[in-house]
Amino acid sequence: MGQRPFSPNHRSGVLNATTAGAVQFNVLGPLELNLRGTKLPLGTPKQRAVLAMLLLSRNQVVAADALVQAIWEKSPPARARRTVHTYICNLRRTLSDAGVDSRNILVSEPPGYRLLIGDRQQCDLDRFVAAKESGLRASAKGYFSEAIRYLDSALQNWRGPVLGDLRSFMFVQMFSRALTGDELLVHTKLAEAAIACGRADVVIPKLERLVAMHPYRESLWKQLMLGYYVNEYQSAAIDAYHRLKSTLAEELGVEPAPTIRALYHKILRQLPMDDLVGRVTRGRVDLRGGNGAKVEELTESDKDLLPIGLA
């Protein structure tokens, strides 16, 4: 079914910045609904799952039947639609009890319901995506210190596994797998940018933890090998390769990717990595100010200002 673009004037009027705009929705961790820093009670797991479904499709209509299928999957009770409506009423009451006009946020619209979020700063997922995209653009242009600022900001939105309190629901598992890939991409590009800025020593400990958690993610192993090598730990870089090779052989019966094998042979021959390690071109961000101002180059003292929360 086609869906109309969201307009803050749709149905219930303009969102009130002092009420609806103060509500924060968080999915990068346990589901949270905060009002000015106070967590609001969200009820039973099924009721929270209804809110999660609406939040993942924010500003779009979610059919009542889709909510029923997501919550009960193949075994919905006879009164499932009415139960969903009860959950919606309970969530509206929670908002109203907190002093928020729920009609500005959670509206009924055939064939179901719509969760209105007028400002993407209200949702941690939207903040993550915006910062991730800015960081990837900066990295592609060689603005690695700027990329670090954005990518680090993106990761600051994560509090734990996606919707970690609702992992028993299939729709959450599917969404979590997809979003975890985005999170690991940000970690990988952050490590790449840090190595380019001469901060391999900072990212190595975090990369070790990440490869332990995601042993088949070869892009993380690549950055770990590079980090060790450019930091003059050739033996550690070689050891990282052999750990990856053993893991893949024993558990999947495959070899590392050709790019990883090529990197390994370059390390063995002690060749320069200029083609693999990015170079800072320009556009360092002054991290001591608010939005930051670009200057010509990254100095040694500036490197200590890089906000890499990876140690």
Swiss-Prot record:
Gene3D superfamilies: Tetratricopeptide repeat domain, Winged helix-like DNA-binding domain superfamily/Winged helix DNA-binding domain. Residues 15-117 bind DNA. It comes from the Bacteria. One of its GO terms (molecular function) is DNA binding. Pfam families: BTAD, Trans_reg_C. Signal peptide: none annotated. The keyword Transcription regulation applies. InterPro entries: AfsR-DnrI-RedD_regulator, BTAD, OmpR/PhoB-type_DNA-bd, Sig_transdc_resp-reg_C-effctor, TPR-like_helical_dom_sf, WH-like_DNA-bd_sf. Keywords: Activator, DNA-binding, Transcription, Transcription regulation. GO terms for biological process: phosphorelay signal transduction system; regulation of DNA-templated transcription. Acts as a positive transcriptional regulator of the molybdopterin biosynthesis moa1 locus, promoting the expression of the moaA1B1C1D1 genes. Belongs to the AfsR/DnrI/RedD regulatory family. Identification of single-nucleotide polymorphisms (SNPs) between the attenuated M.bovis BCG Pasteur strain and the virulent M.bovis strain AF2122/97 revealed a E159G mutation in BCG_3145. The E159G SNP was found to be present in all BCG strains, but absent from virulent M.bovis and Mycobacterium tuberculosis strains. The SNP in BCG_3145 was found to have a subtle effect on the activity of MoaR1, suggesting that this mutation is not a key event in the virulence attenuation of BCG. This is Transcriptional regulatory protein MoaR1.
